[in-house]
Structure formats: structure tokens, C-alpha cells
Amino acid sequence: MRKWLGLLLFPLVAQAAGEGSWQASSIGVTLSNRGVAMSSRPLAPSEPVSGQMSLVVWNYSLIGPTPGGLQVRLCSQSRCTEIDGESGTTQAFNGVPAIEPLRFIWEVPGGGRLIPALKVQSNSVIVNYR
């Protein structure tokens, strides 16, 4: 019984210790040309938070094929990290204020038209902080 009570109270203890998480998502972008970087809308907490980011979970969804050479970065106001794949985790933002918004930056190197265009259906992050 004590074990279950402890498990039930853990989220409250974590909250009291200043730990938490926020989630945000947005619709994606359409990238029609190589050599041009496009940014998602800022993904930010819906309520004020305090603390420093720890583990960040990302996810994005494409409509259609992934262009060869696609580069995707996840950026705060103070730093960026390259991400690989449509979902994953990173600790690259450890120490960044949890209130800072994040953005996905999309780019396919080269020049000329991108056929078919890169269509990002959605972007999302879950930011854990303490």
C-alpha cells in the first residue's frame, strides 16, 4: 500500500521540487527550394515556467518522401542542435531557461527547386525541466 501511495504522490513531490514539463506543437512548413532554411512557428510553454531544460523530446511528421540531404535543427534562442530522424530525444538544451521557445529549422542544401516540395505536417516538443 505504501508503494502505491508513493507512486501516486510522486508527481506532486516532483512539482514541489520545481520539476515539470511542457508540451507544444504546431503545423509544419512547406519548403520549395534548396539552399533556403525555413523555421517552424515558435513552440513555447502555454503558462510561465521556471527552471532549466533537461531532456527534450521531439517529433515531426512529413507528407511525402524525405528529400536527400535534409537537415533539421532544433533551436532555442541561444543554441541549436542537429536532430536525426522524425522523433527522438536530446539533452543539448541542458541549462537553457525552460521558458525559452524552441523552433525546428528545415533546410535541404544546394540550389534550385525542390521537387517534390518538402511538406512538414506537424512539429512537436516535450520539454522536461528542473
Give the ranges of each region predicted by the language model.
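Short, intrinsically disordered low-complexity segments
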Residues: 1-2, 72
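Disulfide-rich extracellular domains of secreted proteins
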Residues: 16-130
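Sec-dependent N-terminal signal peptides
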Residues: 3-13
